[in-house]
Amino acid sequence: MAISNISNPMSSLIEVHMPNFAIIGSGAMGSAVAKRLIDHGATVLTYLEGRSEQTIARAKAAGMVPVGHQDLTKAELILSIVPPSEAIKVADLVADISSGMPAPPPFVDLNAIAPKTMQAVAAHFEGSGVEVLDGAIIGGPPVPGKSGPTIYISGDTAEQSRLLEDCGLRIRRLDGPLGAASALKMCYAGINKGFTGLGTAMLLAASRSGAAESLKAELSESLPDVDRKLSRSIPDMYPKAYRWVAEMQEIADFLGENDPAATIFSGMADLFARMAGDVEGSRVLVRQLDEILARPDIDR
């Protein structure tokens, strides 16, 4: 007896909903975070009006979808990944486009800002119904085959950040109030980028004083781990120096005027501003640093 081919409705494929995200900021970090989310099935919206050709090309290469600013609110989470100096401006934009919505999407600030600045960001959303989450990115941009960076989130009582976790990002929720993630970022960046700044300052001082060759030899012999780290981190800093200026100022603000260490990071801000100008200009300092870092170990 022939058996008819009757389709079973239970065997049909179940459509799985994949979330939409919006990312404001299509720099090296923002576009790489977007690519990680997109590779895990998400759609990532972005706003590119007034951005440079390089930024637009980077966003399109990552697969981000350019939309008008109002359409950013169609996302389930809106992420801000911009230089610290732009964090408040982005908060203003998102607060404006979310105004009057019955259920606006949560806003996640992932910028390198001090807790006080994070509180100022949150204040822009008062009365709007927007849930504001405090985030911090520790590590470099996501790359294929590696799980990092780590994104710390505080103030996420409803675990809204789980959507990001489900789409391939490493999320660690902090048991602390809004500002805890920003504080963690300030402390970590103060150590990590502060170390790079300290090395830059001392190598340039050695170059001016005729001690560069001896300093490099001594570092190679007695502090080889420091020597290797500076040899990587200083050249890596050159294209980022302009962004680190505001971050150092945020760290100084985080420490406060009564902490003498705040002056260290005010000085670091000036140092990175000087480096940023050199990178875009004569590159005299860059050449000095590269010459020192390229010196082979010297036998004694």
Locate the predicted segments by residue:
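NAD(P)+-binding Rossmann beta1-loop-alpha1 motif at the extreme N-terminus of oxidoreductases
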Residues: 10-73
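Rossmann-fold dinucleotide-binding core
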Residues: 113-193
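Rossmann-like NAD(P)-binding element
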Residues: 67-108, 113
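Helical "substrate-binding/catalytic lid" subdomain
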Residues: 184-285
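N-terminal amphipathic/basic-hydrophobic helices that include classical n-h-c signal peptides
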Residues: 1-17, 83
